[in-house]
Amino acid sequence: MIPIRLYTMKRLSFIRYACLLFMVLIPLMARATGQIADDVIIDGEEWRLLGSPLSYNDSIYNRVDSLLPKHEDRSWSTANWSGFYGCWEIVDSCLYLKKIVVNMWDEHKKKSYVLEFDADTLRSVLGEYYTEHGIYARWYSREKLIIGRGELVTYVHGGYLRNHEEELVVTIENGRITHQEHWHNKKVMEGWSLSEGGLTKTGIQIRDSFPYDQFPEMGTKLIIVHVKNISLTSDGHFEDCDASFFKKYDNGEKEWIEDPNHPIIVALKETMRKMYPWEVIYLHGKYTISSPNPGSGFTLPLVNRQQKKAEE
């Protein structure tokens, strides 16, 4: 989640914003579902494509969709809204669509089945991309596309947010791979986690362990902190992170404080440093932690609950 610069929202009180934040986030997380990945063949071996080249371009998607059976006749789910997936192959560093597999449902027989549309059939709607190797994905460019295989090391119940034991991280420009990194990932140890199952417990521990007595000016005010880019040692010790927090001034102005030397940020990091062990994932050459929002971090409310309860 990217920090929102709330000082532009002068008509919303801080408490109203906090309520709005969680009202928005909770339904989104509840609806999120991990998406079925496309298949891709590389040097004769099967991998999983953690992205959707067909959905990258609306015109391409609509042309393909118009060729397939009506959506209401397909067997679709929240893990595959379209009801179909693509089978690809990488040949000489170029990405080709070989066929599309459509999941169907026979209402009369109460039985599922599949229909396949090969490159020759797809040629009728994607003729300008047709080659002897298949449909050349010249419409597709991506700075960072993950292609994986093997057991899952991380998994978030939404989109393609997961990591496999073995991964290729590639850059694609107009259907051609221009850069590739090959990684072997693994889960090193269990501990304090930011995964969907552990984030709540970890957040409560941070909230309840924060040294509120060092900041009497906070009183019972609620502040929102944002943490991302957590770095860990291989044996589960917290090293550092990027942190910021929301501050509301007496005159009503609001802003995010990002100064790493601010006492509240220093205290937050020290609180996290005292927590041990942290879950450790070896991912793409670094020791890190799984997160429901990889690269974006998480947002956490801090409030002195004991003082607030005493005042009540």
Regions found by a protein language model. Name each.
Residues 250, 255-312:
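Short, positively biased Gly/Pro-containing turn/loop motifs at secondary-structure boundaries
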Residues 219-254:
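Short tight loops/turns at secondary-structure junctions
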Residues 1-36:
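Bacterial Sec-dependent N-terminal signal peptides
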Residues 98-161:
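An exposed acidic His-Trp-rich patch
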Residues 173-214:
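Surface-exposed beta-loop interaction hotspot
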Residues 35, 81-85, 163-166, 222-227:
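Short, surface-exposed coil-to-beta transition loops
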Residues 31-98, 102-104, 110:
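Start-of-domain marker
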